[in-house]
Amino acid sequence: MSESGGMVKSVHVIPLKRVYFGRRMNRADRAIRLVRKYVARHFKDAEKIILDPELNKYIWSCGREKPPRRVVVEIRFNKNEKEARVFLKRVK
């Protein structure tokens, strides 16, 4: 975790395998909710959680029924505004 001013940056690997236990028709929807829930659990002070559109596209890339099993994200938490922004981390 790196900290500068009121901003905290951290990289997390979020496992999404739990969404495969339920019905097939709404797995991507549940994956988005699971990401929000994960961020809320790890950043308890966050009043607002904003997901990047690229992350949303990545989760929906294989359709509604087959989201990825895990996703690597960078979370930027602004302590002053109590806002967490979630970005897709590009792994090269």
From Swiss-Prot:
GO BP, sorted A to Z: translation
One Gene Ontology cellular component: ribonucleoprotein complex
Source superkingdom: Archaea
Keywords: Ribonucleoprotein, Ribosomal protein
Name of the molecule in the record: Large ribosomal subunit protein eL31
An example Gene Ontology molecular-function term: structural constituent of ribosome
Xref: CDD domains: Ribosomal_L31e
Gene: rpl31e
InterPro entries: Ribosomal_eL31 (IPR000054), Ribosomal_eL31_dom_sf (IPR023621)
Family: Belongs to the eukaryotic ribosomal protein eL31 family.
